[in-house]
Amino acid sequence: MTKNKKPTHFDAIIIGSGPGGEGAAMGLTKAGLNVAVIERENSVGGGCTHWGTIPSKALRHAVSRIIEYNQNPLYCKNNSSLHSTFSQILGHAQDVVNKQTRMRQGFYDRNKCSLIFGEASFIDAHTVRVKNADNSTDLYSADKFVIATGSRPYHPEGVDFDHSRVYDSDSILQLEHDPRHIIIYGAGVIGSEYASIFRGLGVKVDLINTRHRLLEFLDNEISDSLSYHLWNSGAMIRNGETFEKIEGTDDSIILHLESGKKMRADCLLYANGRTGNTDKLNLNKVGLTPDSRGQLAVNQNYCTDVDHVYAVGDVIGYPSLASAAYDQGRFVAQAITTGEAQGSLIDHIPTGIYTIPEISSVGKTEQQLTADKVPYEVGRSQFKHLARAQIAGTEVGSLKILFHRETKEILGIHCFGERAAEIIHIGQAIMEQKGDGNTIDYFVNTTFNYPTMAEAYRVAALNGLNRLF
């Protein structure tokens, strides 16, 4: 039953309250527009806050602190150790999610942005129908629309996700038992992160990689470091494998691989790909057709093929990062209010991968520079040689700077180790400097606090410059 026969009208309607939707909403409301955000769940934040970035990183942080405690020589001498299960640390993750949700709700309230909870679908080019929790519906119209519905785990045919022992990267957060052995199918960013988390809790892990090496987009040395660290922690990595079938029993999962191998575990996490959340929007009513992955094509202003409909975030594909989605939302607000986005995503977007230890990189890899025949040199710093790492007990890891032999321009930075996603931003800031500002000499000529992890840049710079002749 539709409660309002005449649609409630807004200047702009944003579908989805994740980072992209939030960025667009804040920009548009601050510009004075009458804005509504439609969210299908019962609280704001989107997948990033509720099933993706925030809970998984909270889990990772809790596990890494347990590992750090148990490896600290002081506590080892006193025969003191911590043990926790996946279900126990889920409570910590939920606390963080609740804090994030309350904070983001406050953003909308303070900016007088209308929040509508329900599932939206187009009925014509300027009108959406919203299905409410009580199955009633309401109509809303707008001059402009922003689609920021995000993505969800890909569910291939042949995998029974209704089985109680089969999970995807969303449902794993509702894991109701504590497995002793888990199979993770898919060794991308999500699969590798969860492999680290479960192995850190002492769970036996089989990580099935459909490619020939882990995270092939990374610099080879960093990818190899992750492979070694997972192997050294006891994880079993199987590269170049694809599944033939997944067989479920009452208390286990049997994975059959096309190579003939098979393995049994308490449960399986399928983490191999994502698809855009566009299938329930009735986009044909507005004249749009998503691609096979549920994604929409946009121009430099994030406008789709329909000039009053924009899209941001995972639903448009690369780079599929929460940080980038928020920026895209801001740019859309500019495009709607002024006719053109006043900015664009930077050329070198940093990668942050929250394995244990972390991985982060920005710029070119060694294999890319070699293929392009760029005369580069390498500067390295091992964390085990840094006083701060020795004090903190985080000696596993390294920082690598790639720079041009002749101009000394920084071309790429790659970090493996605790706090890598934070450390990378120092180098990123220098890489973004114009002209002669981007030079490895900066790290030699500046004075760092001591002892700090930032000192790794000075050590790596000196190491690299000493290779020149």
Curated annotation (Swiss-Prot):
Details of cofactor binding: Binds 1 FAD per subunit.
Subcellular location: Cytoplasm
Annotated GO MF terms: dihydrolipoyl dehydrogenase (NADH) activity; flavin adenine dinucleotide binding; NAD(P)+ transhydrogenase (Si-specific) activity
UniProt cofactor(s): FAD
Disulfide bonds: none
InterPro entries linked: Class-I_Pyr_Nuc-Dis_Oxidored, FAD/NAD-bd_sf, FAD/NAD-binding_dom, FAD/NAD-linked_Rdtase_dimer_sf, Pyr_nuc-diS_OxRdtase, Pyr_nucl-diS_OxRdtase_dimer, STH_gammaproteobact
The enzyme's E.C. designation: 1.6.1.1
One example of a Gene Ontology biological process annotation: NADP metabolic process
GO cellular component: cytosol
Main location: cytoplasm
Keywords for this protein: Cytoplasm, FAD, Flavoprotein, NAD, NADP, Oxidoreductase
Catalyzed reactions: NAD(+) + NADPH = NADH + NADP(+)
Similarity field: Belongs to the class-I pyridine nucleotide-disulfide oxidoreductase family.
Job of this protein: Conversion of NADPH, generated by peripheral catabolic pathways, to NADH, which can enter the respiratory chain for energy generation.
Official protein name in the record: Soluble pyridine nucleotide transhydrogenase
Organism the protein comes from: Photobacterium profundum (strain SS9)
